[in-house]
Amino acid sequence: AFDIIHLPPLRERQDYILPLAEHYAVRMCRELGYSYFAGFTRHAKAMLQDYSWPGNIRELKNVVERSVFRHGLEDEPVDEVIL
């Protein structure tokens, strides 16, 4: 028999969104060869927090990776989140 584990959707775990986004952004920066991640602007953080994340963590990961890649600037924080 298998146990069932209920994990609430990301939209119900607002406190997890920014730490997870930072984690995935740092990983993407390493993959791109950046020496560090400059962070997200207030505008970008608000976009991340306000979105409903129907695709949960997998969607968050993809959005963050795409946004960091398209931003393309190591020394400036990401301002535009590409949803």
Give names to the regions the model predicted:
Residues 1-83:
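Nucleotide-binding/hydrolysis machinery
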